[in-house]
Amino acid sequence: EIRHINGLYAFLDELARRHPGLILDNCAAGGRRLDFEMMRRCIVLWRSDSTWGAKTFPQNVQAMTHGLSYWLPLHGLGAAATDDLALRSGMGACGGFSINYRDPKAVLALRMYLDRYLKIRPIFTGDYYPLTAHSLDKTAWIAWQYHRADLNESVVQAFRRPEATSETLTVKLRGLIPEQRYEIGRAHV
């Protein structure tokens, strides 16, 4: 197995040598290809196929974003559905979508999501702050914040899991300037 991995590294190095500026995407295979050597050679636009069609899709995606963002600044996933929870759960620095593009309702839902997403996308390159503990628990909230100090803007993603009894979540936001006034918008209630 190690010869296979070393061969893969050599292959990627040769591609980069022959094609300067080439950007390589690494499907992370559920995290099995998220080692430091691969991260040096590729970006991870697709973390895992394990979430497609899974009954735990939102929780899995949310947990991946919450955990990976500690140490991997650019990674992505996306959504295979156009409901608001699926789209927001897959939101991050990059992403992809697997929908029926012949379905006008699906295309409209994706268009509305993209209009919203494109306004905040630059913030996903900012500092990352987890606002809750990491959890797959369906009774818990999970939340995190991306903050761009240079823009004085943040995005907070907070998800109330399906069996959570608390209707509200109190968190301490990072990067706020004392005495500064802030405008708060909601993507979904």
What are these language model-derived features?
Residues 1-6:
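The substrate-binding groove and active-site-proximal loops of carbohydrate-active enzymes
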Residues 8-186:
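Active-site-proximal substrate-binding groove within the catalytic cores of carbohydrate-active enzymes
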